[in-house]
Amino acid sequence: MDAFIATFTSPGPELFQLGPFALRWYGLLIAIAVLIGLNLSSSLARKRGLEQGLISDLLPILVLTSVVGARIYYVAFEWRNYSGNNFWSSINIFGLAIPIPSAVEIWGGGIAIHGALLAGTLAVLIFCRWRRQAFWDVLDVLVPSIALGQAIGRWGNFFNNEAFGVPIKGDLAWKLFIPFVNRPLNYANNEFFHPTFLYESIWNLLVFTVLIVLFQRSSKGLLKLPAGALSCIYLITYSLGRVWIEALRTDPLCLGALPPSCEGGLRIAQLMSLAMMAVGGFGLWWLYGRKRKLPDPGRPRSFA
């Protein structure tokens, strides 16, 4: 009996087009992830006793800064593709070509989750100082939604035919077809690749499950989970998966080298993941090894 083969083939990045405007799958998936995250984190915030409406006030700021941060991060490491003769592009509005910097064409793909995490964390910090909230408590109710949002958003890579892995060698029970136009030059003759979007989506669902189970057990008093512990666990568990999945990617952001191999250089996402694991590990050691609270950069409310 032949092994079951699941072949993933993208229908294309656009769901439909209305005049000059197109609804892209990636944008729709992000919108769905944001709505689910709003409801989930709001529910977790109530269980943590946080201020009512806090998450709905934070969310627009968090989404905007995360998207901008993700794009800036990506463009910074891929600047060769957005500079010189590639600096300018155009957008067609009712038949009129409007010149714009190519770096702002986010609808064409090109964002990096680590940039979103850095910018988003900074936004949460500033927001907490402004609203005098405990930074780690707020972050703890956000990270399950972040993990779930990543699981959903990774399917945008599938529709865009991007962020895929190396060609499949031998027989696998799954494979991803990539059109010729989207293949790296050195893999132009390969049709099927590792669906790294699927690997990371599944991994993020597992991370989400772990975080939710831990949160619920803590809420019921079955587990001691100090403020910040859940955030540290997210940093470690997400990064563990990203390190090995990134090794399969054909389009990594590289430092001192060019994709797909980054030969002679370093894969930025792996470096960032290792740094996140170190931060998360240190945080857990501080909480459970030294039995001390994490320093709070926010301004907790005074109940005096």
UniProtKB/Swiss-Prot annotation:
Topologically, how does it sit relative to the membrane?
Multi-pass membrane protein
Per the record, the major location class is membrane
Its subcellular locations are: Cell inner membrane
Gene Ontology MF, one: phosphatidylglycerol-prolipoprotein diacylglyceryl transferase activity
Alphabetic keyword roster:
Cell inner membrane, Cell membrane, Membrane, Transferase, Transmembrane, Transmembrane helix
Binding of a 1,2-diacyl-sn-glycero-3-phospho-(1'-sn-glycerol), residues: R154
- Cellular component per GO, a single term: plasma membrane
Q: Which InterPro entries match?
A: Lgt (IPR001640)
| Positions of transmembrane segments | 18-38, 58-78, 106-126, 133-153, 195-215, 221-241, 268-288
Q: What is its EC number?
A: 2.5.1.145
The metabolic or biological pathway listed in the UniProt record of this protein is: Protein modification; lipoprotein biosynthesis (diacylglyceryl transfer)
Listed GO biological process terms:
lipoprotein biosynthetic process
Which purpose does this protein serve, as stated in its record? Catalyzes the transfer of the diacylglyceryl group from phosphatidylglycerol to the sulfhydryl group of the N-terminal cysteine of a prolipoprotein, the first step in the formation of mature lipoproteins.
Q: List, alphabetically, the PANTHER family matched.
A: PHOSPHATIDYLGLYCEROL--PROLIPOPROTEIN DIACYLGLYCERYL TRANSFERASE, PROLIPOPROTEIN DIACYLGLYCERYL TRANSFERASE
Q: Which family does it belong to?
A: Belongs to the Lgt family.
**Protein name from the UniProt record:** Phosphatidylglycerol--prolipoprotein diacylglyceryl transferase
- Specify the species: Prochlorococcus marinus (strain MIT 9313)
